[in-house]
Structure formats: structure tokens, C-alpha cells
């Protein structure tokens, strides 16, 4: 966008992302906005994680401290969420941003969108809530309170249109074309003292504390079970960047007997996945990273019983994993709740290792990855946001 068409020399945006994945996408968006219009003086502030802060977004709310899971956990942490909500409202009132970009995190952001819309602030929702999967009734909140909805999955625009929501732009998935390993399997093994000639299984329990507490124990049980059958298999436990490795180490230390063939890494998720023959991954964005890297996987998840009971009444789809939802069928095994146990997980992971099955699933994942769109989603999202703000800004 050339500067002779741009109406403002400065632009103030509030950005709100509450999950680790949203924080990463927010950082990419901020960088894309700066690159698209270097002549604009941007001011970014809002609810941030590590990556948005690294992208020089001023933090009004540190969302690393709000990274929870489930309805019950949100209820017990309600004072923290209310305080975050209050501080963002104060910041929006005092600074009067030109627009607010809400990234995913619908439990919080849809409520904030309602307040912002009422005060006349332009609301842009990037990475639209997965209402097609559960709680579809919230589409009315999108219709009422969101001025521009940027979707990242190919079928979402049509889904929203069928519900009378037409201010939707499909930009593609931010991960498409951007998920690459910095180095190959041999280098990964060298750095982590692994044998490149022996099978490697990665374990990714998620980015929230409660995910570690619920999902990591059965993962460790699965690794122990597999080790009894195949002593040659090596395990890599990948800790999310926003988590303290000590949290995982405490869980690992509690296992008896201790696992001798487990490597714990804090960074290098993509390198670990690319080097792996198979992986067990908590349902979420990491499963798409694995698909883009072609890593055969088992998708796992475990909620508290009360949350699972409530969610079961709200979910509208047969599959839970994004990989299967995008495929439109079950390609990757999903182990949810009671099925997320060490014995079952061990069996499914072992089933992924034979070369014929492994190669077949890698081919399926490559086809699914192709449905995520072309590279440059953050740049396209930035262009849509800039065009929207320009078109809705009155001439001086």
C-alpha cells in the first residue's frame, strides 16, 4: 500500500491474544503490519505473551499468567481474568485505539468485543473462533460485535456466510509455508545425544499447566510401556516455550522407575517433530505443525471430568483434532479422555512405526497441509486490516 493513499501517519492498535499460539500469530501480524507500511508510525499495546513482547508490543496484560484450560479452571481464576478485562478496558478508554485486533481466545475476546463495539471501537477478529466445532450459537456475537473477521481455514467463510455473516475474509493459515526445521535429523540427534539410526518418538503435552498435569503422566506411561517392548526407541519430551521445564521435570521424577531414554528439550519443537518417526501431541496448533512437517502422530487430550461432561454437550463435530477436521475425516487417531492412557497411547504410537504405515500417513498429512493455503497469511491479514481501517476512516 503506497503512502500517498494512506490517510494517517500514525496508527494505534490494541492487540489481544491469550494463548501461546495466538501470541505467536500476533507477533507475526505485528511484524507484517510494520513491513507493509514502514511509513506509518505504529503503536501496539494489549494482552501479550513472550513473542508479542519480543515484537515490541507494550504489555498491558501478561497472558502467560492466564494460560489455563477448561471452564472450571477459568472459574477458579475468575479474579485474574476480571482484572485483565478491567485493565484492557481502561487502556482502550484512555488510549482510544484506531482499532482492536482480537486473536482467537473466544471465552475472553467475545466478551471484550461486546464492550468495544458498544463504545464504537472498530473490532477486528483474527483467527476466528471455531464455532463450527462447538457453541455455534455464538455466531450471533460475531455478527453483532465484529466489524471484520479474518478466517484461517478454507471452509470457514462459507460456514459464516450461511449464518448471515458476510464481513469475513479468508487469509490462509499463518503456519502454511512457515513451518520448517532449522536443521535436520542428524544435527538434532547430535545436539541432544540421540542415535539417528534408532526410532525417535516426540511427546508434546501442550502449553498450559493443566495440560502438563493431565496429559504428561499418560505420555510418560506410554513411553515406559513402549520401552519394555522396544528398548531401541528414544523419546523426546518437548516443553512449550512459555512453560518452565521444572514443571515437567517434577512429573517425570515422580515416575517409577525413571525413564533413561527420555530427552527433555525446551525449545526446538519443529526440529524435534521433523526428526521424529512418530509423535503424541496434545490437540491444538502443534498438530498442524506436525502435519506441515509430515510427522505421523497420535492426537491426545484429557480434561477434568466436569469440563469433559460440559464440552460433550456443546461440541458439534465427530473429530476433535484440527488435522482431522481439515481433512473432513479421521486420518489421525485421536485418544480423548479415558482413551488417553499409557497402554492405548503406546499401542497407537507403535502402530505408526512400520515403514509402510509411516509412509502412507506422511502422504496423507502432506495432502492435508496443502489445504491450509499458501504462505503469507500474516501478510494477507495485515493488508486486509490496513485496507479495512483506511476504508472506514473518515476523510479529514
Positions of predicted regions on the chain:
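Nucleotide-activated sugar donor-binding and catalytic core shared by glycosyltransferases
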Residues: 3-396
